[in-house]
Amino acid sequence: MNDILETETPVMVSPRWDMLLDAGEDTSPSVQTQIDAEFRRVVSPYMSSSGWLCTLTIECGTIICACR
């Protein structure tokens, strides 16, 4: 159990963000609409099968979930 706490959490970055940044636009992953879209894309399949409803709070960077 202690090993889990000591390992570094992997960070997932959307390939779409990388493309926008490489294109030279002043767009970053912190843009709320991009974060919301990626969150829905990644989390939606799990929410529909599990009965949980989740949202991401950008201020704290936390995921809040509630059972339907």
From Swiss-Prot:
What GO annotations for molecular function exist for this entry?
signaling receptor binding
UniProt entry keywords in alphabetical sequence:
Antibiotic, Antimicrobial, Bacteriocin, Lantibiotic, Oxidation, Secreted, Thioether bond
Q: Could you name the domain of life of the organism this protein comes from?
A: Bacteria
Instruction: Cross-link Lanthionine (Ser-Cys): give the residues.
Output: 49-54
Asked if the Swiss-Prot or TrEMBL record annotates the protein with the keyword Isomerase, the reply is no
Annotated function: Lanthionine-containing peptide antibiotic (lantibiotic) active against S.michiganensis subspecies sepedonicus strain 2136 (MIC=30 pmol/ml). The bactericidal activity of lantibiotics is based on depolarization of energized bacterial cytoplasmic membranes, initiated by the formation of aqueous transmembrane pores.
Write the protein's name. Lantibiotic michiganin-A
Q: What is the originating organism of this protein?
A: Clavibacter michiganensis subsp. michiganensis
